[in-house]
Amino acid sequence: MDTLCLSHHFLIAMPDMEDSLFARAVVYMCDHGEQGAMGVIINHGADLTLDSLLGQIGLDGCRPDQVGLPVFVGGPVQSDRGFVLHEPIGNWQSSLTVTDNVALTTSRDVLAAVSHHEGPERLIVTLGYAGWEPGQLEHELAQNAWLTVPADMRIVFDLPVADRYDAAIRLLGIEPSALFGSAGHA
């Protein structure tokens, strides 16, 4: 039997998702295996910018092109902790390698490097992450709570936040307006 692995995929919330935290969410999946799954929501802003976050934790500034970058609500788990999804991988104290070029870092050194204009070329910062116990995500998928598609990092790093949900759906060849909230089982 093939094992489902959704690392480096998007989970796209179905339109009828009732949990307000995950309504219209696009989750970039960082890890999925026997121990469960984890990812970060890439399209729900936290009413905070990267430069203001750096100031709050005692770090000075960021590159001019990073001023005003939104910080995201990454999910309900460890929502008081920062998670940096970035390219390239680099050499940071605490990183989870997702692909040959993408990592999720939780150590302060990556933010310190950003404040000194030496951090990763492309990044988003989230507060918290979305996590699933073993079998929980598979159950939600069987209940048609999520769509899945291989991730396109241009959606993560290049698209305006408001366009990410529809763009992720279009990766499936579906127009968002044609997507209905529930599906049946034969």
Curated annotation (Swiss-Prot):
Q: Name one GO cellular component term.
A: cytosol
Q: Name one Pfam family in it.
A: DUF179
Q: Which Gene3D superfamilies match?
A: VC0467-like
InterPro entries, per the entry: AlgH-like
Kindly give the SUPFAM superfamilies that the UniProt entry links to this protein.
Answer: VC0467-like (SSF143456)
Lineage, top-rank taxon, reads Bacteria
**Which family would the database say this protein is a member of?**
Belongs to the UPF0301 (AlgH) family.
Listed name of the protein? UPF0301 protein LHK_02881
Q: Which organism is this protein's natural source?
A: Laribacter hongkongensis (strain HLHK9)
